[in-house]
Amino acid sequence: MRKKKFLSRFSFSSLFLLCGTLLSACTGIQADLRNLIKETTGKDIDLSKAIKTKEGKKNIIASLKKSYEVNPKDTTKLLLDAWKQSFEEGKLGIADFDFDHVAYPQTNDPFTMERKVDHFQMTYQSFKDLLVEARLSYTFNWFGDYSSGDFTAKRGDKHYFYLFLKIKSDPKKQFSAKKFLTEGEAFTDQEGKQTTRNLEWIEFSASISWWTKGKDDVSQKSLKKFLESFATNTGYSSDINLFSYLEYLIK
Protein backbone atom coordinates (compact mmCIF):
# COMPACT_ATOMS: atom_id res chain seq x y z
CA MET A 1 0.00 0.00 0.00
CA ARG A 2 2.83 2.42 0.81
CA LYS A 3 4.41 1.75 -2.55
CA LYS A 4 1.10 2.42 -4.32
CA LYS A 5 0.67 5.72 -2.47
CA PHE A 6 4.21 6.76 -3.35
CA LEU A 7 3.66 6.03 -7.04
CA SER A 8 0.38 7.95 -7.07
CA ARG A 9 2.04 10.85 -5.33
CA PHE A 10 4.99 10.74 -7.72
CA SER A 11 2.71 10.67 -10.78
CA PHE A 12 0.74 13.66 -9.50
CA SER A 13 3.92 15.59 -8.79
CA SER A 14 5.28 14.81 -12.25
CA LEU A 15 2.05 16.01 -13.85
CA PHE A 16 2.14 19.18 -11.78
CA LEU A 17 5.73 19.89 -12.81
CA LEU A 18 4.90 19.26 -16.48
CA CYS A 19 1.93 21.64 -16.40
CA GLY A 20 4.07 24.20 -14.59
CA THR A 21 6.80 23.90 -17.21
CA LEU A 22 4.37 24.41 -20.10
CA LEU A 23 2.72 27.35 -18.34
CA SER A 24 6.11 28.95 -17.64
CA ALA A 25 7.14 28.54 -21.27
CA CYS A 26 3.93 30.16 -22.53
CA THR A 27 4.26 32.96 -19.97
CA GLY A 28 7.88 33.43 -21.05
CA ILE A 29 6.92 33.93 -24.69
CA GLN A 30 4.22 36.42 -23.66
CA ALA A 31 6.64 38.37 -21.49
CA ASP A 32 9.31 38.41 -24.20
CA LEU A 33 6.80 39.57 -26.80
CA ARG A 34 5.42 42.32 -24.58
CA ASN A 35 8.91 43.56 -23.67
CA LEU A 36 10.11 43.48 -27.28
CA ILE A 37 7.15 45.54 -28.47
CA LYS A 38 7.55 47.99 -25.60
CA GLU A 39 11.27 48.46 -26.26
CA THR A 40 10.92 49.05 -30.00
CA THR A 41 7.58 50.90 -30.25
CA GLY A 42 6.94 52.30 -26.78
CA LYS A 43 3.60 50.46 -26.62
CA ASP A 44 2.67 48.35 -23.61
CA ILE A 45 0.09 45.94 -25.02
CA ASP A 46 -2.09 43.69 -22.87
CA LEU A 47 -1.60 40.64 -25.07
CA SER A 48 -4.21 38.42 -23.42
CA LYS A 49 -6.88 41.00 -24.28
CA ALA A 50 -5.51 42.09 -27.65
CA ILE A 51 -5.35 38.54 -29.01
CA LYS A 52 -9.14 38.18 -28.66
CA THR A 53 -10.06 40.84 -31.24
CA LYS A 54 -9.19 41.47 -34.89
CA GLU A 55 -8.03 45.00 -34.13
CA GLY A 56 -5.93 43.72 -31.26
CA LYS A 57 -4.28 41.10 -33.46
CA LYS A 58 -3.57 43.69 -36.13
CA ASN A 59 -2.02 45.95 -33.48
CA ILE A 60 0.28 43.13 -32.35
CA ILE A 61 1.36 42.35 -35.92
CA ALA A 62 1.91 46.03 -36.78
CA SER A 63 4.00 46.41 -33.62
CA LEU A 64 6.02 43.31 -34.49
CA LYS A 65 6.61 44.71 -37.97
CA LYS A 66 8.09 47.83 -36.40
CA SER A 67 10.13 45.63 -34.05
CA TYR A 68 11.49 43.65 -37.00
CA GLU A 69 12.53 46.86 -38.77
CA VAL A 70 14.32 48.14 -35.65
CA ASN A 71 15.56 44.88 -34.11
CA PRO A 72 15.39 42.01 -36.64
CA LYS A 73 17.60 39.66 -34.60
CA ASP A 74 15.45 39.57 -31.45
CA THR A 75 12.19 39.64 -33.41
CA THR A 76 13.33 36.68 -35.51
CA LYS A 77 14.31 34.77 -32.37
CA LEU A 78 10.94 35.44 -30.75
CA LEU A 79 8.95 34.28 -33.78
CA LEU A 80 11.02 31.13 -34.25
CA ASP A 81 11.01 30.29 -30.53
CA ALA A 82 7.20 30.44 -30.63
CA TRP A 83 7.16 28.20 -33.71
CA LYS A 84 9.47 25.64 -32.09
CA GLN A 85 7.58 25.55 -28.80
CA SER A 86 4.17 25.27 -30.48
CA PHE A 87 5.34 22.56 -32.88
CA GLU A 88 6.80 20.49 -30.04
CA GLU A 89 3.43 20.71 -28.27
CA GLY A 90 1.68 19.37 -31.39
CA LYS A 91 0.52 22.65 -32.97
CA LEU A 92 2.09 22.07 -36.40
CA GLY A 93 0.44 24.85 -38.35
CA ILE A 94 0.83 22.80 -41.56
CA ALA A 95 -2.41 21.05 -42.49
CA ASP A 96 -0.77 18.48 -44.79
CA PHE A 97 0.62 16.52 -41.84
CA ASP A 98 -2.79 15.85 -40.29
CA PHE A 99 -3.55 13.46 -43.20
CA ASP A 100 -7.24 13.34 -42.30
CA HIS A 101 -8.40 14.24 -45.80
CA VAL A 102 -6.23 11.46 -47.24
CA ALA A 103 -6.62 8.65 -44.71
CA TYR A 104 -10.36 9.11 -44.26
CA PRO A 105 -11.74 9.55 -47.80
CA GLN A 106 -15.10 8.01 -46.83
CA THR A 107 -14.89 8.53 -43.04
CA ASN A 108 -15.94 4.92 -42.43
CA ASP A 109 -12.62 3.08 -42.17
CA PRO A 110 -12.45 1.53 -38.69
CA PHE A 111 -9.37 3.24 -37.29
CA THR A 112 -8.36 6.42 -35.52
CA MET A 113 -5.06 8.19 -35.97
CA GLU A 114 -2.71 9.66 -33.38
CA ARG A 115 0.25 11.94 -34.02
CA LYS A 116 3.24 12.83 -31.86
CA VAL A 117 6.30 15.01 -32.40
CA ASP A 118 9.34 12.89 -31.53
CA HIS A 119 12.08 15.30 -32.56
CA PHE A 120 12.31 18.94 -33.66
CA GLN A 121 15.54 20.74 -34.44
CA MET A 122 15.79 24.30 -35.74
CA THR A 123 19.02 26.01 -36.83
CA TYR A 124 19.37 29.50 -38.27
CA GLN A 125 21.33 32.73 -38.37
CA SER A 126 18.38 34.49 -39.98
CA PHE A 127 15.21 33.54 -41.84
CA LYS A 128 17.27 33.22 -45.01
CA ASP A 129 19.21 30.14 -43.85
CA LEU A 130 16.55 28.62 -41.58
CA LEU A 131 16.52 24.81 -41.45
CA VAL A 132 14.01 22.68 -39.56
CA GLU A 133 14.42 18.91 -39.25
CA ALA A 134 11.75 16.95 -37.42
CA ARG A 135 10.41 13.46 -36.93
CA LEU A 136 6.71 12.81 -36.39
CA SER A 137 5.24 9.46 -35.40
CA TYR A 138 1.73 8.34 -36.37
CA THR A 139 -0.34 5.46 -35.00
CA PHE A 140 -3.34 3.83 -36.68
CA ASN A 141 -5.55 2.36 -33.91
CA TRP A 142 -7.96 -0.19 -35.38
CA PHE A 143 -11.32 -0.49 -33.61
CA GLY A 144 -12.82 -2.84 -36.21
CA ASP A 145 -11.85 -5.46 -38.77
CA TYR A 146 -10.82 -4.38 -42.26
CA SER A 147 -9.91 -6.20 -45.46
CA SER A 148 -9.06 -4.92 -48.94
CA GLY A 149 -7.00 -6.88 -51.47
CA ASP A 150 -3.94 -8.31 -49.73
CA PHE A 151 -4.29 -5.92 -46.79
CA THR A 152 -6.10 -6.93 -43.61
CA ALA A 153 -6.36 -5.46 -40.13
CA LYS A 154 -8.13 -6.70 -37.03
CA ARG A 155 -9.75 -4.90 -34.16
CA GLY A 156 -7.09 -3.92 -31.62
CA ASP A 157 -4.25 -3.79 -34.17
CA LYS A 158 -1.87 -0.85 -34.12
CA HIS A 159 0.16 0.27 -37.12
CA TYR A 160 3.01 2.74 -36.77
CA PHE A 161 4.89 4.94 -39.19
CA TYR A 162 7.32 7.84 -39.05
CA LEU A 163 7.42 11.03 -41.08
CA PHE A 164 10.82 12.67 -41.54
CA LEU A 165 10.37 16.36 -42.27
CA LYS A 166 12.63 19.09 -43.60
CA ILE A 167 11.66 22.77 -43.87
CA LYS A 168 13.83 25.47 -45.42
CA SER A 169 13.30 29.05 -46.47
CA ASP A 170 11.96 29.38 -50.02
CA PRO A 171 14.83 31.13 -51.86
CA LYS A 172 12.35 32.75 -54.27
CA LYS A 173 10.34 34.42 -51.48
CA GLN A 174 12.63 35.90 -48.85
CA PHE A 175 11.25 37.02 -45.50
CA SER A 176 11.00 40.79 -44.96
CA ALA A 177 8.96 43.43 -43.13
CA LYS A 178 6.44 43.19 -45.97
CA LYS A 179 5.45 39.73 -44.68
CA PHE A 180 3.70 41.22 -41.63
CA LEU A 181 0.19 41.35 -43.09
CA THR A 182 -2.86 43.04 -41.60
CA GLU A 183 -4.77 44.42 -44.59
CA GLY A 184 -7.69 42.76 -46.34
CA GLU A 185 -6.89 40.65 -49.38
CA ALA A 186 -9.15 40.43 -52.44
CA PHE A 187 -9.73 36.97 -53.88
CA THR A 188 -12.21 35.01 -55.99
CA ASP A 189 -14.16 32.26 -54.21
CA GLN A 190 -15.21 28.89 -55.67
CA GLU A 191 -18.40 30.40 -57.09
CA GLY A 192 -16.45 33.09 -58.94
CA LYS A 193 -17.49 35.91 -56.60
CA GLN A 194 -15.05 38.66 -55.63
CA THR A 195 -14.69 39.06 -51.88
CA THR A 196 -12.23 40.34 -49.28
CA ARG A 197 -10.46 38.17 -46.76
CA ASN A 198 -9.15 39.73 -43.54
CA LEU A 199 -5.55 38.89 -42.79
CA GLU A 200 -3.72 38.43 -39.51
CA TRP A 201 -0.59 36.86 -40.92
CA ILE A 202 3.16 36.86 -40.49
CA GLU A 203 4.05 34.97 -43.63
CA PHE A 204 7.07 32.70 -43.89
CA SER A 205 7.45 31.14 -47.33
CA ALA A 206 8.90 27.67 -46.87
CA SER A 207 10.22 24.86 -49.00
CA ILE A 208 8.90 21.64 -47.43
CA SER A 209 9.92 18.04 -48.09
CA TRP A 210 9.35 14.76 -46.28
CA TRP A 211 9.40 10.99 -46.51
CA THR A 212 7.63 8.30 -44.51
CA LYS A 213 8.50 4.82 -43.29
CA GLY A 214 6.47 2.08 -41.60
CA LYS A 215 7.85 0.71 -38.34
CA ASP A 216 7.45 -2.88 -39.60
CA ASP A 217 6.22 -4.73 -42.70
CA VAL A 218 2.55 -4.66 -41.67
CA SER A 219 2.71 -0.95 -40.86
CA GLN A 220 4.42 -0.32 -44.19
CA LYS A 221 1.50 -2.04 -45.95
CA SER A 222 -0.94 0.12 -44.01
CA LEU A 223 1.02 3.22 -44.96
CA LYS A 224 1.01 2.22 -48.62
CA LYS A 225 -2.70 1.42 -48.54
CA PHE A 226 -3.90 4.70 -47.06
CA LEU A 227 -1.15 7.26 -47.67
CA GLU A 228 0.74 6.11 -50.75
CA SER A 229 0.27 9.39 -52.62
CA PHE A 230 1.58 11.34 -49.62
CA ALA A 231 4.36 8.96 -48.58
CA THR A 232 7.11 11.07 -50.12
CA ASN A 233 7.32 14.69 -51.19
CA THR A 234 10.60 15.94 -52.61
CA GLY A 235 9.72 19.59 -52.12
CA TYR A 236 6.99 22.17 -52.55
CA SER A 237 6.45 25.77 -51.53
CA SER A 238 4.00 26.62 -48.76
CA ASP A 239 3.28 29.78 -46.75
CA ILE A 240 3.37 29.27 -42.99
CA ASN A 241 1.61 31.76 -40.70
CA LEU A 242 4.07 32.44 -37.87
CA PHE A 243 1.47 34.55 -36.07
CA SER A 244 -0.66 31.42 -35.52
CA TYR A 245 2.02 30.07 -33.14
CA LEU A 246 2.06 33.26 -31.08
CA GLU A 247 -1.74 33.21 -31.01
CA TYR A 248 -1.71 29.59 -29.81
CA LEU A 249 0.73 30.34 -26.98
CA ILE A 250 -0.92 33.57 -25.84
CA LYS A 251 -4.43 32.07 -25.72
UniProtKB/Swiss-Prot annotation:
It comes from the Bacteria. InterPro entries: Lipoprotein_3. Keywords: Cell membrane, Lipoprotein, Membrane, Palmitate, Signal. A lipid is attached at residue 26 (N-palmitoyl cysteine). Residues 1-25 form the signal peptide. It is a lipid-anchor. Pfam families: Lipoprotein_3 (PF00938). A lipid is attached at residue 26 (S-diacylglycerol cysteine). PROSITE patterns: PROKAR_LIPOPROTEIN. The keyword Signal applies. This is Uncharacterized lipoprotein MPN_271. It comes from Mycoplasma pneumoniae (strain ATCC 29342 / M129 / Subtype 1).
